Amino acid sequence: MHPVEIEQALASIVCLIDTREQPTDALRERVKAIGFPAKRQKLNYGDYSAEITLPRGERVDLSAKFSIERKMSIDEMAACFTSQRERFAREFERAKANGAKIYLLVENASYEKIFGGRYRTKVTPNALAASLFAFMARYDCTPIFCRDESTGRVIREIIYREAKEFLQNL
């Protein structure tokens, strides 16, 4: 694809937001920070992905290629690795079976907080770290930690780069 066509397609990015993301003030602020037009639709895995329009008008849903699974805290992530592990693993297994990449974005988290047990759940730091690293190895999952005020920008950057890589490889 020609660089001009790539730029045209990148200008058409629409952020896809899973319908299970609760319509809160925080979501509205996040969407504003993402900066792309947004569309709510059911995603098979993850909370955010993208859709682009190719130069000839064909819409391409990239949610089968990549998605971003957002967690608002280490505590929410820990629940996904403990009480909700079966459901969470199924979501990652679906993505892996489709060859999709999942970014696990955890707000207000760091490895230092995980290793130091600076969270409110009862899961031990070793168990939580082991689960996170096991998911990374098993599902080729990429964890990203950021402050909640940066989440929209991080999502925007992931979407833009994934869309650009997709277009450059057409």
What role is predicted for each listed range?
Residues 1-64, 75-170:
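Non-catalytic C-terminal interaction segments of nucleic acid-processing enzymes
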Residues 66-72:
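Conserved catalytic cores of phosphodiester-cleaving nucleases, focusing on short active-site segments
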